[in-house]
Amino acid sequence: MIVKTLLDTDLYKFTTSYAYIKLFPYAMGTFSFNDRNETQYTEDFLKALKAEIKNLSQLRFTEEELEYMTKNCRFLPRVYWEWLSSFRFDPNKIDIHLDEACHLHIEVTDLLYKVTLYEVPLLAIVSEIKNRFFGNVADMNEILCKLSEKIELSNQHQLRFSEFGTRRRFSIDVQETVIKKLNETAQYCTGTSNCNFANRSYEKSVIYWK
């Protein structure tokens, strides 16, 4: 199971969802996946992807997660987080298939304040399964070497930045390794937008470490 918690997403997805509730509570919307590379996939890939998407329906906010978000995100009212504790991803609302050219199509249609929550988890799942099926292996030595160079540049020139890698991550394990390195050595990294990592590993407020 790739996405194991509702918090494995970017914080702005929650703020966007709340904005839709306040401004457009009855508006419907559609999230459409667009593969700019026009990658050709296999039926085995599609089967694995559908299995992961089915798993999304099992996700629930835990009491600990709810408490963490209400405490650290007071710019969103508690009633919103309590609503999220009853929210469930619905695989039946996700249309996923390969066309005749083996290109991947994904569409999710629902109320805007719900459909926006599907985007990041779906993209993270597609990315990780794609790397797995295409035999791509992360070279952690190379990743950490390049990351160290960027951290050194940031530290030297006081360049502030944030980590927003969830939707395009190679895998959840690679993202965690990168975030740990940033947390330990990047003086001007303001944090991660991934609520799960902010909650689970670093005892920092969502987004901000410093």
Residue ranges of predicted features:
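Ordered alpha/beta subdomains of enzyme catalytic regions
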Residues: M1-K210
